[in-house]
Each structure stands twice: as C-alpha cells, then as structure tokens.
A protein has these predicted regions:
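A small-molecule sensor/coupling module
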Residues: 4, 19-24, 85-90, 98, ...
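Short, proline-centered helix/strand-breaking motifs
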Residues: 12, 103-104
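Cyclic nucleotide-binding regulatory module and flanking cytosolic helices
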Residues: 1-31, 35, 80, 113-114, ...
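Cyclic nucleotide-binding regulatory domains
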Residues: 13, 36-96, 108, 122, ...
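Hydrophobic residues at beta-strand termini and immediately following loops
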Residues: 32-34, 69, 102
Length: 130
C-alpha cells in the first residue's frame, strides 16, 4: 500500500472505502504544500478540486464565520458540489500545511462509485452553510 493510500485511509470521511477504492482515489490525487500565511483558495475562484489536510492547520474564512481545519478534515468540496463551481471561502495556511488535492474528475468518480461518501460530503457541505 502506498503512503498516499495510507494517508487517505486515515481520513475519517474515507475510512469506509476498501483498499482498491483508496488506491484508485490515490491515483487521481496530487500534493499541495504551503507555508504559514499562504492563501490556498479565495471566494469567487473556480473550484478545480478539493483538499484533505494531512499535516498542519488551515484557516477558513467564510460568510458564516471563521474556523480552523486540521489533519483528516477537508475543504473545497462546496465548489464541486454546486452547479456554479465557485469557491465560497478564503482558505489560508495557518501553519505549514500539506494537503492531498483531488481533482474534479477524480472527485466525480468517487461520488459516482461511492454514494455513501457523496451523502456525507453533502451533509458536511450543507452543515457548513448553516
């Protein structure tokens, strides 16, 4: 099992996926590293992927407030779940951070193949809009 697959398996949202599904997902990912203070997304930008935090902390500034996300958490999914495909939040690295980036095509395949993950993502996304 690759390191990337192991990192994905540690993410609570993906914990129910079998090894084959995790390896397929890992093949469609890349790594994003950022230094503290570096912006990662900004409102209005077109969302081309979502991100799972592996190391470090990010700060999310959204219309509903500011929150921090750490290892095992994710951001950027709302832009992929809506027709508009636009980012709704400003995200910056609060500490040095390493994320796994999932592109739109891989994300859409994941949702199609695993409706349970799609439901959890939708629930999480809607919860963030409250």
């Amino acid at each position: 099992m690759s390191t990337r697959t192991e990192e994905l398996r540690a993410i609570p949202l993906l914990a129910g996926l079998d090894l084959l599904a995790l390896e397929k997902l890992a093949a469609g990912t890349s790594e994003l590293e950022a230094r503290a203070g570096q912006p990662l997304t900004h409102p209005g930008a077109t969302g081309t992927g979502m991100f799972f935090v592996v190391e470090g902390t990010v700060e999310v500034e959204a219309p509903e407030g500011v929150r921090e996300l750490g290892p095992g958490e994710f951001f950027g999914e709302l832009a992929l779940l809506t027709d508009k495909g636009k980012r709704t939040a400003r995200v910056r690295a609060k500490t040095p951070v390493r994320c796994i980036a999932v592109d739109r095509a891989t994300f859409e395949t994941l949702l199609k193949d695993h409706p349970d993950v799609a439901a959890e993502l939708l629930e999480a996304g809607l919860g963030r809009l409250d």
